[in-house]
């Protein structure tokens, strides 16, 4: 019983980690942006949007 419970808990943690990774802002230096002053891109919804600053 405890074995399957631990496996379920592990699966829940894995899903939570995957979703938190998906909505996180991923930053790099303006290689993907039209404006060289913009360098922060949000990758959550599959396409990044360039922004001048990166919010935590």
Curated annotation (Swiss-Prot):
Name of this chain's protein: Conotoxin Cal6.41b
Tissue-wise expression: Expressed by the venom duct.
Written domain comment of the UniProt record: The cysteine framework is VI/VII (C-C-CC-C-C). The presence of a 'disulfide through disulfide knot' structurally defines this protein as a knottin.
Main location: secreted
Key word Transcription regulation present: no
Residues of the signal peptide: 1-23
Function: Probable neurotoxin.
Alphabetic keyword roster: Disulfide bond, Knottin, Neurotoxin, Secreted, Signal, Toxin
Gene Ontology molecular function: any one: toxin activity
Location relative to the cell: Secreted
Cystine residue pairs: 27-41, 33-50, 40-54
GO cellular component terms, semicolon-separated: extracellular region
């Amino acid at each position: 019983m405890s074995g399957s419970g631990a496996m379920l808990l592990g699966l829940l943690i894995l899903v939570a980690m995957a979703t938190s990774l998906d909505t996180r802002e991923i930053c790099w230096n303006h290689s993907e942006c039209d404006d060289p002053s913009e360098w922060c891109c949000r990758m959550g919804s599959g396409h990044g949007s360039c922004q001048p600053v990166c919010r935590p």
